[in-house]
Amino acid sequence: MKKILLSMVCLMAVLALAAQSTAKKFVLNLTADGESNLTCYLPQNPSGRAVVDCPGGGYSHLALNHEGYDWAEYFNKQGIAFFVLKYRMPHGRYTVPMEDACKAMRTVRDSASVWNINREDVGIMGFSAGGHLASSVSTLAEYDARPNFSILFYPVISMKPKKGHGGSSYNLLGEEGVKDEKLVDHYSTEKQVRRHLTPRAIILLANDDGAVPPVTNGVAYYSRMRQVGNECSMCIYPTGGHGFGFRSTWPYHDQMLSDLTRWLDSFKAPRKDAIRVACIGNSITDGSGIDMATQKGYPAILQNKLGDGYEVKNYGLSARTLLCKGDVPYMKEMGWRDALAFQPNIVVIKLGTNDSKTHNWVHKAEFGKDLQTMVDSLKALPSKPEIYLCSPIPAFKPSWTINDSVIVNGEIPVIKKVAKKNKCGFIDLHSKYTFADLMLDDGIHPNGKGAVKMAEIIYEAISEKK
């Protein structure tokens, strides 16, 4: 009898300890009819991190327990706020789940101060078809709804029925939708990964998954993330099939939790009071030709130099022009919208290299006007950023008809004039970047060591006003 009583006391103590991890649980309707809602679990000791969870179910139903509610204690114990999303089934109305997921992300961010959450540390998690939804929000959503990190369990990634999961494809896109190649490609999220803009991710799946082929789904997403240089990890377990979720009977359950915990511990969110720096530019800012440019391009090096009191983001986009009539205008891209939504405190603009190309410079009369438009958009932001206009670095070779004479005689005088008119800082990269030996073979893009030199020049300019 004493042993039984002792066991009961121990069990009650464990249950009480578990209950302490969650300070508050409640359900919040996202639609007026309650068809979409969030079950919210706020931790006793909040770390500021949050995760919005999208259970799977082939876009026909939701596995709300082992891919939803059962995870609450795991996250709350780490101080992570956890939100299980009940999203509406699409029945061929492919925008419906995305609308619910984006609303959930915005709701969490809008309530950040009340729920003790860092707006810049909100992740998304999804399983199977819910993994497809999570990856869709990660790649297609606008900045305010896009997560800071993604956790994808055995995700459906391809919307091609024979490559992904036929039921998910037909339920999301409909009978006619799966015949529309553009629509299928749009929702095949490995095709929508964007360098610097798609958040870091971890993908977890079993090698023997027979329902959602790993190679054309989870592995394909990882491959694309790695190809563009985004941060991504993958854990493939020997067995487990499809749909193991939080089931403790799965042999690799404890290892999976350990792997996920270590990954979550491997990165920190920016400080809430960090000074936000947006690096706007073309492929030179992007880090074209530098493997893992997200970590080794000039903005990443600038981040290391400035320290954790700053949050530096890379908004470089290859081939883009300042000119709105150029072949690929920067201000028509998601990266530009992201840079504005970031509400930067400091902006570094380095554009003009591609504008010097023969077919773009025919619109030279509008170069100053378009630069002024960009500056005006930034000055109108509530964050009132300090703006630095950079001259392009030298074009050491005339690759792709990029013309250094046009840069020197046509662009730089205009950039200086706009900088003076708007009281912007001017960083003369063209004069200060003299490192022809630190360029790639094309003579246009700096190599890794050249990116370090660029970061040093820009850091020096920013530091003068620190």
Language-model segment annotations:
Residues 273-279, 284-372, 406:
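Conserved SGNH/GDSL esterase-like catalytic core that processes O-acyl groups on lipids
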Residues 241-247, 290, 393-466:
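Catalytic His-Asp segment of secreted/periplasmic serine-dependent ester chemistry enzymes
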Residues 219-271, 441-444, 448, 452, ...:
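C-terminal catalytic histidine-bearing segment of alpha/beta-hydrolase fold enzymes
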Residues 48-56:
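Short beta-strand element of the alpha/beta-hydrolase
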Residues 63-70, 83-119, 248-255:
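Catalytic nucleophile-loop/oxyanion-hole region of alpha/beta-hydrolase
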Residues 210-217:
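Conserved alpha/beta-hydrolase "acid-adjacent" motif
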Residues 202-206:
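Short beta-strand/loop motif that positions the catalytic acidic residue
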Residues 103-168, 184-185, 189:
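Primarily recognizes the serine-hydrolase "nucleophile elbow" in alpha/beta-hydrolase
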